[in-house]
Regions:
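The canonical Cys-X-X-Cys-His
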Residues: 59, 64-68, 112
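Thiol-based oxidoreductase modules, predominantly thioredoxin-like and allied folds used
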Residues: 59, 78, 82-98
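Typically the conserved alpha-helix immediately C-terminal to a functionally engaged Cys/Sec
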Residues: 68-81
Length: 159
């Protein structure tokens, strides 16, 4: 009986260590030391809405591990696209953001949108896109290309 208990406990212990090791190796449990709110990237939401540039809007919370892991990528795309996009960070739990959080139907975190006030357009970027920097850049470039076509069409219609 004692031998069965020792074997069972040993197997469970090895299983737990294996799961934790796998999660850590794949970054599932790792986060950066900085909280998302400490990054201070971008401009206030109301300023982005008054701009002609589209905005990349990040909905986050400080307790969200995926939000913490995404922040270095958000910092990179801010540097790469600061001339083409405004960047906005909205804490999904802050009372002052509750209206936009409800309007955007935020159900998971982090959530990334392109808001384009000029064309009253909103594009949700899924986590399959934004967690892969190459895919995210492709999507951001695609949107800029479409926007240039819209700008050209609008200028032709005005003539």
């Amino acid at each position: 009986m004692k031998k069965k208990i020792i074997i069972t406990v040993s197997v469970l212990f090895i299983a737990v260590l294996t799961i934790l090791g796998y999660g850590t190796a794949n970054g599932a449990f790792s986060t950066t030391d900085m909280l998302p709110s400490e990054y201070k990237i971008g401009i206030p939401y109301y300023q982005a809405l008054q701009s002609d540039k589209p905005a990349i809007v990040l909905f986050y919370t400080d307790w969200c591990g995926y939000c913490k892991r995404f922040m270095p990528k958000f910092k990179i795309i801010n540097k790469l696209y600061k001339d083409d996009y405004n960047f906005v960070m909205l804490n999904a739990e802050a009372k002052e953001n509750s209206t936009v959080v409800n309007d955007a139907a935020i159900s998971g975190l982090p959530t990334l949108y392109i808001f384009d006030p000029k064309y009253e357009n909103r594009v949700h970027l899924t986590n399959g896109i934004y967690m892969d920097l190459k895919k995210l850049r492709k999507e951001l470039n695609r949107y800029l290309s479409i926007r240039k076509q819209l700008d050209f069409s609008a200028s032709c219609a005005a003539k």
